[in-house]
Amino acid sequence: MCAAVCLLLNCGSKPTSASKQAEKDGIPVWVYGGRKDNTGLYAVGAGKLSNDITSRKMAVAQARLELAQSVEVSVKGITQTLVDDQGAEGDRQFLAALSENAALTTEAILNGSEQADMFKAGDGTIYVLMYLPKSTFVTELTKKASTFNRTSSAAYTEEKMAEAYEKYFSTNK
């Protein structure tokens, strides 16, 4: 999963085997390789059910699940880094609880996702490219951190979490 986040967050300009395969098959490159830029996260979902409407719903659900997993992995990574950096046991407990609490806000974060593209393959499979702006999840995670029940010693930690979310998601491409 961590590799998937790295793949989503890293930009590359070399043609990949996925893009070569996509060109060969006559389908959009993003179906195989997703899309990458520094404004947000992208995820691809696929569905092939009895009709296009339910196939699209399935594809959107799969892509949103992938977005949720990417955000969760990123939040856990940021939080673990801060937990490792903090010395006080109380702050460590706060960060662990905040990380768990932030995972619960995934639905609010995903409400900011949008369909960026869709493709219907010759075999009837519907592919959907979903996009989640970084500003959406940084805002939601910061909101969650600021409303979290905290002690005075944890206020500093809360501030560091907000800074870490902003820094991580605005600098990783």
Task: Please give the residue ranges for each predicted region.
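Sec-dependent bacterial lipoprotein signal peptides
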Residues: 1-14
